[in-house]
């Protein structure tokens, strides 16, 4: 996994990955003075709560201390994982890497602000990654939806990427000489969410839900730059 690199991971909780030297720190008080020179950085943060305050604290308030801590290191690239939430469309529109960013909720605006702050600090050294819904660690949520959903109000387009494909794409960026400033990462197979729930219902021999309306919500997201790069998915659909 290391591919010859020395890897250090930092989080607020213990980790047991054998391939990395792990430090327990709060990124808001980040101290990298005792590390060997760091030349490649991945920023992958997750808020403890999905509120506006949670997004502000996790994504935006952490930028300045991270930037400050990295000033003494020879950073060649910083890869910042954001989200396709920065795209505010919600009527079944097609979105790709050339789409204009127009967040419509405060969480989306805060993610975009985080992106801009890192781009201002690192310019062409910054690569922003916007994954769609990440799956592959647990199907508990979908099983619960399958068991409890008898009807669905509309056709809601959903998009996803397997966690292993996302990790592989992040890792292979090290070998890309001239990366794009940003990449959407998704499996390029938008699916109405009710169809995913129905699939689980069939596997579990449960009654299939009924769709109440043909109104479209959500968005159909395509990773045009990822596809152009030649990256091959190992999990092309979620079924």
Pin down the residues of each PLM region.
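N-terminal Rossmann NAD(P)H-binding glycine-rich loop of SDR-like oxidoreductase domains
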Residues: 1-5
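NAD(P)H-binding glycine-rich loop region in Rossmannoid oxidoreductase-like domains
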Residues: 19-65, 69
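Mid/C-terminal beta-alpha module of Rossmann-like enzyme folds, strongest
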Residues: 167-222
